[in-house]
Amino acid sequence: MFPMVTGFMNYGQQTVRAARYIGQSLIITLSHSNRFPVTIQYPYEKLMTSERFRGRIHFEFDKCIACEVCVRVCPIDLPVVDWKFERDIRKKRLLNYSIDFGICIFCGNCVEYCPTNCLSMTEEYELSTYDRHELNYNQTALGRLPMPVIDDYTIRTIFNLPKIKSK
């Protein structure tokens, strides 16, 4: 009979311990219930990107001197730079510049090491397409600046969301 009594005591201790764990979990759950939601409704609401966000690369054709530093510092040799040497002015003339964003890892080395600052990172991150060949941007597509999230009147940014009053 003694083992049966110790069994009931152990069962009682385990029940109390389980109730305490459930109570602690409930307290944590209730403390999280009055917080601001982390998720957003993506197509209709967008978060503001940080100042140093590494999005799509913007290219300024007029500033490029075809030095190919961007190709040399790229870990995957991604930018394609076509140029022609002009003998009369003894300089390279840029013919074509393209980047395939399906392969790009957005490391930012090309932007950082460009001597003429003709490359910059934008806040555009919506690059999804149905055809992977549409991700190959030439100098015309790279030169278009995206519409900033702040200026897009169809989008509610995180700053425009209603505030939850804390106690």
Curated annotation (Swiss-Prot):
GO cellular component: chloroplast thylakoid membrane
Cofactor names: [4Fe-4S] cluster
UniProt cross-references to Gene3D superfamilies, sorted A to Z: 3.30.70.3270
Cofactor binding: number and manner: Binds 2 [4Fe-4S] clusters per subunit.
Gene Ontology terms, MF aspect: 4 iron, 4 sulfur cluster binding; iron ion binding; NADH dehydrogenase (ubiquinone) activity; quinone binding
Membrane topology classification: Peripheral membrane protein
Subcellular localization, as worded in the UniProt entry: Plastid, Chloroplast thylakoid membrane
Keyword annotations from UniProtKB, A to Z: 4Fe-4S, Chloroplast, Iron, Iron-sulfur, Membrane, Metal-binding, NAD, NADP, Plastid, Plastoquinone, Quinone, Repeat, Thylakoid, Translocase
Residues binding [4Fe-4S] cluster 1, per UniProt: C64, C67, C70, C114
Gene Ontology biological-process entries: photosynthesis, light reaction
Reaction equations catalysed: a plastoquinone + NADH + (n+1) H(+)(in) = a plastoquinol + NAD(+) + n H(+)(out); a plastoquinone + NADPH + (n+1) H(+)(in) = a plastoquinol + NADP(+) + n H(+)(out)
Listed EC numbers: 7.1.1.-
Residues binding [4Fe-4S] cluster 2: C74, C104, C107, C110
PROSITE patterns membership: 4FE4S_FER_1 (PS00198), 4FE4S_FER_2 (PS51379)
Keyword Heme belongs to the record: no
Domain 4Fe-4S ferredoxin-type residues, every copy: 55-84, 95-124
Family: Belongs to the complex I 23 kDa subunit family.
Assembly behavior: NDH is composed of at least 16 different subunits, 5 of which are encoded in the nucleus.
Function summary: NDH shuttles electrons from NAD(P)H:plastoquinone, via FMN and iron-sulfur (Fe-S) centers, to quinones in the photosynthetic chain and possibly in a chloroplast respiratory chain. The immediate electron acceptor for the enzyme in this species is believed to be plastoquinone. Couples the redox reaction to proton translocation, and thus conserves the redox energy in a proton gradient.
Identification of the protein by name: NAD(P)H-quinone oxidoreductase subunit I, chloroplastic
Organism: Pelargonium hortorum (Common geranium)
Primary gene name: ndhI
